[in-house]
């Protein structure tokens, strides 16, 4: 019964579509611009770094908040907390409010790491940031960073926690399957982070 409740809580928090809500408040349906993905990277590319960052932070809080409540109120284990994060990832990728068409769970993964093993967050960005700045491939940086973090969970925590992190990593990788194909073909879209955080948003509000 506890498993069911934790899964439901994680899923419902994860289903909050900030990647849709934030652009919509500015008159933009993010599903109709750029890649059409309801995620922080697409928001960043089309609305600029500020709104992209806001979206990513809010997405990160989706697993972080229920994990913190569960840990400090009910004393759940780290593996149970990680399970909440995994189902938040499922909710983010397949939100009930948007006909199960959501994002790719990178920010949710970072939020889960923050809530279960915060010491690994700097490691994530230490891998992610150089890759993205050098290659300009957000997808490549995200997948490789989460791969490193998954290995570290197995090395520094229980195997149960590692399994849930592996499940979250596989979910995120699966959601990036199109990106992986484009990376192999040399067709993946590049994202200049510096430009994204300095350019003015050129999108006009939709009627």
From Swiss-Prot:
Q: Where in the cell is it found?
A: Cell inner membrane
Identify the pathway. Answer: Lipid metabolism; phospholipid metabolism
GO BP terms: namely: phospholipid biosynthetic process
Give the stretches traversing the membrane: 3-23, 50-70, 78-98, 120-140, 151-171
Gene this protein is translated from = plsY
User: Topology versus the membrane, per the UniProt entry?
Assistant: Multi-pass membrane protein
Would you tell me the Gene Ontology cellular component terms? plasma membrane
UniProt entry keywords in alphabetical sequence: Cell inner membrane, Cell membrane, Lipid biosynthesis, Lipid metabolism, Membrane, Phospholipid biosynthesis, Phospholipid metabolism, Transferase, Transmembrane, Transmembrane helix
InterPro entries documented for this protein: G3P_acylTferase_PlsY
**Enzyme Commission number(s):** 2.3.1.275
Describe the family membership recorded for this protein in Swiss-Prot or TrEMBL: Belongs to the PlsY family.
Q: How does it assemble?
A: Probably interacts with PlsX.
Q: Which organism is it from?
A: Kosmotoga olearia (strain ATCC BAA-1733 / DSM 21960 / TBF 19.5.1)
UniProt GO MF annotations: acyl-phosphate glycerol-3-phosphate acyltransferase activity
The protein's name: Glycerol-3-phosphate acyltransferase
Q: The organism sits in which domain of life? A: Bacteria
Q: Which reaction does it catalyse?
A: an acyl phosphate + sn-glycerol 3-phosphate = a 1-acyl-sn-glycero-3-phosphate + phosphate
Enzyme superclass (EC): transferase
* Protein's job: Catalyzes the transfer of an acyl group from acyl-phosphate (acyl-PO(4)) to glycerol-3-phosphate (G3P) to form lysophosphatidic acid (LPA). This enzyme utilizes acyl-phosphate as fatty acyl donor, but not acyl-CoA or acyl-ACP.
């Amino acid at each position: 019964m506890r498993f069911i409740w934790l899964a439901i809580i994680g899923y419902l928090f994860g289903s909050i579509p900030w990647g849709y809500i934030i652009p919509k408040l500015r008159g933009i349906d993010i599903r109709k611009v750029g890649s059409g993905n309801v995620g922080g990277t697409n928001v960043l590319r089309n609305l600029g770094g500020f709104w992209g960052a806001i979206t990513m932070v809010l997405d990160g809080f989706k697993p972080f908040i229920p994990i913190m409540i569960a840990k400090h109120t009910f004393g759940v284990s780290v593996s149970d907390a990680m399970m909440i994060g995994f189902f938040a990832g499922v909710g983010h990728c397949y939100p009930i409010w948007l006909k199960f068409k959501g994002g790719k769970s990178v920010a949710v993964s970072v939020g889960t790491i923050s809530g279960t093993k915060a010491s690994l967050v700097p490691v994530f960005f230490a891998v992610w940031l150089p890759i993205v700045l050098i290659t300009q491939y957000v997808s490549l940086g995200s997948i490789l960073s989460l791969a490193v973090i998954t290995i570290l969970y197995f090395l520094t925590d229980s195997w149960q926690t590692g399994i849930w992190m592996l499940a979250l990593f596989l979910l995120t990788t699966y959601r990036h399957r199109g990106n992986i194909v484009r990376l192999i073909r040399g067709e993946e879209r590049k994202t200049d982070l510096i430009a994204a955080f300095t350019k003015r948003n050129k999108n006009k509000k939709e009627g």
